[in-house]
Amino acid sequence: MDKLIITGGVRLDGEIRISGAKNSALPILAATLLADGPVTVQNLPHLHDITTMIELFGRMGIEPVIDEKLSVEIDPRTIKTLIAPYELVKTMRASILVLGPMVARFGEAEVALPGGCAIGSRPVDLHIRGLEAMGAIIDVEGGYIKAKAPEGGLRGAHFFFDTVSVTGTENIMMAASLANGRSVLENAAREPEVVDLANFLIAMGAKIHGAGTDTITIDGVKRLGSATYKVMPDRIETGTYLVAAAVTGGRVKVKDTDPTILEAVLLKLQEAGAEVTTGEDWIELNMHGKRPKAVNVRTAPYPAFPTDMQAQFISLNAIAEGTGAVIETIFENRFMHVYEMHRMGAQIQVEGNTAIVTGTEVLKGAPVMATDLRASASLVISALVAQGDTLIDRIYHIDRGYECIEEKLQMLGAKIRRVPG
């Protein structure tokens, strides 16, 4: 198993390019199954989950054509099987996203219950209930979701999400694009990745209004055609590198990104004492060598502070001046990295869904273990500022969400290297 070794104490300085958003690319790849012609998706990040999704398509009989820039052309007309097997699905929660498109386009699907990060309960019942509202007949047996469309296809439905669900919104929106009649999704997720998926569906000919608000209206169409589409930049990768620069007292310019979808994070970085400047597709952060000030953070659905940036801000508070509270309202069990940070000397108390972080001037390098994707990013950030060497184990978690993390950090001056397991 690969490990990262990081020697801390270097002030980050430089420029990097941001990759395409994994959380946008995965639903967009799933949505290509709705097309009745070839579709090209550009700006895919080079990540394990993306490779797994493309491999899943290969198992179904679709032969994706990939170029060296990781654009992929997919022609779903060659599909031979409508089963998403457990051995592929178990490593990736996003595999549930093929359920809606397959039922809508081909009338049936068999998808293994998904795996992925071990963060609390992420139930798939909203996906199932949404499709049932559209007339699908669904059984969950033997670890598989088996779904069939009614005769004549899925029907438009009015569906209210009991809790805001990004993948639930995406799955039902995709299915509704080819359903008969109008669907209205209430309490829908407003995340930029949902908007990106809607824009891709619209590029294929879907009729969707209200993406980015909590009510999305979809008028089903008979067919969706070919399209070429560029995946949006990754706002969480963007935020992670900005926090890394802030923690080390450095300066970084991130390019090929979008400041408008990261406003809650940028405001908190300014509150921590960072100088932040933005352009149309870039953000520059400069700490001028200062130590950050501790900030209070409360996660909530977009446009509020994103849960996927919570762990990084615990790292920021751990070396900041003062004390900051980080309240997690989206997922339970999302403070697993705190116990690894204790090994580096961080002063963090967890009380329920709140982490109280008292900043310390010095963290010490130590052997630590990544527990999930974003938690592993927080360990990397802490290691960048710690005295001595930090060895991070189980970094396959990092590779699920960050493209070439060591190369990008090296470009900013970090002393980081990968050691093959």
Swiss-Prot record:
Catalytic reactions on record: phosphoenolpyruvate + UDP-N-acetyl-alpha-D-glucosamine = UDP-N-acetyl-3-O-(1-carboxyvinyl)-alpha-D-glucosamine + phosphate
Alphabetized Gene3D superfamilies for the sequence: Enolpyruvate transferase domain
Stored Pfam families: EPSP_synthase
InterPro entries linked: Enolpyruvate_Tfrase_dom (IPR001986), Enolpyruvate_Tfrase_sf (IPR036968), MurA_subfamily (IPR050068), RNA3'P_cycl/enolpyr_Trfase_a/b (IPR013792), UDP_GlcNAc_COvinyl_MurA (IPR005750)
Functional pathway: Cell wall biogenesis; peptidoglycan biosynthesis
Gene Ontology biological-process entries: cell division; cell wall organization; peptidoglycan biosynthetic process; regulation of cell shape; UDP-N-acetylgalactosamine biosynthetic process
Coiled coil spans: none
Sequence positions that bind phosphoenolpyruvate: 22-23
Keywords: Cell cycle, Cell division, Cell shape, Cell wall biogenesis/degradation, Cytoplasm, Peptidoglycan synthesis, Pyruvate, Transferase
Residues where 2-(S-cysteinyl)pyruvic acid O-phosphothioketal is found: 117
Main location: cytoplasm
E.C. number(s) listed in UniProt: 2.5.1.7
Binding site for UDP-N-acetyl-alpha-D-glucosamine: 93, 122-126, 308, 330
Cellular component terms per the entry's GO annotation: cytoplasm
Highest rank taxon of the organism: Bacteria
Recorded GO MF terms: UDP-N-acetylglucosamine 1-carboxyvinyltransferase activity
Active-site residues, record numbering mapped to chain: 117
Subcellular location: Cytoplasm
Family to which the UniProt record says this protein belongs: Belongs to the EPSP synthase family. MurA subfamily.
Functional summary from the UniProt entry: Cell wall formation. Adds enolpyruvyl to UDP-N-acetylglucosamine.
UniProt name for this protein: UDP-N-acetylglucosamine 1-carboxyvinyltransferase
Species assigned in the record: Pseudomonas syringae pv. tomato (strain ATCC BAA-871 / DC3000)
Lineage of source species: Bacteria, Pseudomonadati, Pseudomonadota, Gammaproteobacteria, Pseudomonadales
Gene name of this polypeptide: murA
